[in-house]
Amino acid sequence: MRSHLVKPGSVYDGIEPGELGESTESVQDRVRQLESRNSFLEEQCSQIESEKRYLENQKIKYEREIRKLQSELDRMKTSPLIIGTVIDVIKNDRIIVRSSNGPQFLVNVSQYIDEKKLLPGAKVALNQHTLAIAEVIPSTEEPFVAAMEVIESIEVDYDQIGGLDEQIQELQEAVELPLIEPERFARIGIEPPKGVLLYGLPGTGKTLLAKAVAHRTNATFIRVVGSELVQKYIGDGSKLVREIFEMARKKAPSIIFIDELDSIAARRLNETTGADREVQRTLMQLLAEMDGFDKRKNIRIIAATNRPDVLDPAILRPGRFDRLVHVPMPGIEARGKILKIHCGKMTLAGDIDFKKLAKVTEGMSGADLKAIATEAGMFAVRKDKALVEMEDFLEAVEKVSMAADTQKMMPGNLPETTMFV
């Protein structure tokens, strides 16, 4: 029997009620399947779009990399430039330069170069074909020379140096005061000493004094060992000396400390070898720099040597090293002060008698006294003690004394009258 809800002539006319329910359920299933399929396709579409964006980013990245590599390739294919030096500046953008090969040329200048930088002596890059100035090369320091500048703060002060009060005062007057309070000298009408030579036996504190000066002044401190100025090739040592003083002028106020001065300033002899002649060239360059036509107002020189007897007389004359400071072996009072300084951070027992230690260390240098303090601490560590006792110091004195006696018996330290058979 037909349902009264079905109108005649409708799409459902002729369909039984059961059949209509079954058809509705199948349509709903089909709709759910289509919706699920649609969600899956939307996810796929979103994933594809994400991959597309990633590939586009990768494309941009690789294109940028290609441009970078192409630029580097073009740069590597660029013809090299010739290094030259400006000799003179002429009007109408014309410059006289000397190429690295030696001859001089009158060349043009690029309009993009600042003319203020084109001073005589400036390094420039020249076009290989036209020799026109392409760019001005900034002046650079020799790495070997730049490494001589002491950048780190040196933790050594005058209160850590015992028994050298007079030497400290002379060093302050000759080095510190001219840099810190130059008006004192101007008021009196004198020029301060230009150089100070510290001389004395090894281990007496010459280098320590120089370190204290570096700590107390805000000046640029340039440390040079004399043997570093002795170079293999002709002219290299003289060039280093020039560049050291040039750096000192640029970074003034500055202090140049030359350790082991006797290695380059030994007395000149008539009979010399090729190596000796190169050392003499370096010495002559040092003498020329110390004299100079320009006054070294803010540059002070300190030198140290164990052998003042072998120095060339030319370097000791007034105007070069004006003040000679003898750093002697410490006396009994000075030895006591030095021992107290080196034992300042040590955990000591109450029986330490510094006066007695100063007496039994007769003839020892400051370096020997520091070795005694270290050895005493080592004896205490060996015995697993909590404190360093007097007996540890006495054992250390004996050990250091034996080492010093052994060193004196070595062939290089024997008197000149000693002969070996």
Curated annotation (Swiss-Prot):
Binding residues for ATP: 203-208, 342
SMART domains with a match to the protein in the record: AAA
Mention one GO biological process in which this protein takes part, according to its record: proteasome-mediated ubiquitin-dependent protein catabolic process
Q: Which GO cellular component terms are attached?
A: cytoplasm; proteasome regulatory particle, base subcomplex; proteasome-activating nucleotidase complex
From the UniProt record, which GO molecular function terms apply? Answer: ATP binding; ATP hydrolysis activity; proteasome-activating activity
SUPFAM superfamilies on file: P-loop containing nucleoside triphosphate hydrolases (SSF52540)
For this UniProt entry, what is the primary localization, expressed as one broad class?
cytoplasm
* Keyword Ribonucleoprotein among UniProt keywords: no
Give the record's keywords alphabetically.
ATP-binding, Chaperone, Coiled coil, Cytoplasm, Nucleotide-binding, Proteasome
Cysteine pairs forming cystine bridges in this chain are none
Subcellular location(s) per record: Cytoplasm
- Residue stretches in coiled coil: 22-79
* Main function: ATPase which is responsible for recognizing, binding, unfolding and translocation of substrate proteins into the archaeal 20S proteasome core particle. Is essential for opening the gate of the 20S proteasome via an interaction with its C-terminus, thereby allowing substrate entry and access to the site of proteolysis. Thus, the C-termini of the proteasomal ATPase function like a 'key in a lock' to induce gate opening and therefore regulate proteolysis.
Instruction: Give the record's family classification.
Output: Belongs to the AAA ATPase family.
Q: Which PANTHER family match?
A: 26S PROTEASOME REGULATORY SUBUNIT
Q: How does it assemble?
A: Homohexamer. The hexameric complex has a two-ring architecture resembling a top hat that caps the 20S proteasome core at one or both ends. Upon ATP-binding, the C-terminus of PAN interacts with the alpha-rings of the proteasome core by binding to the intersubunit pockets.
UniProt free text on domains: Consists of three main regions, an N-terminal coiled-coil domain that may assist in substrate recognition, an interdomain involved in PAN hexamerization, and a C-terminal ATPase domain of the AAA type.
Record's HAMAP family?
PAN
What is the name attached to this protein's record?
Proteasome-activating nucleotidase
Species of origin reads Methanosarcina acetivorans (strain ATCC 35395 / DSM 2834 / JCM 12185 / C2A)
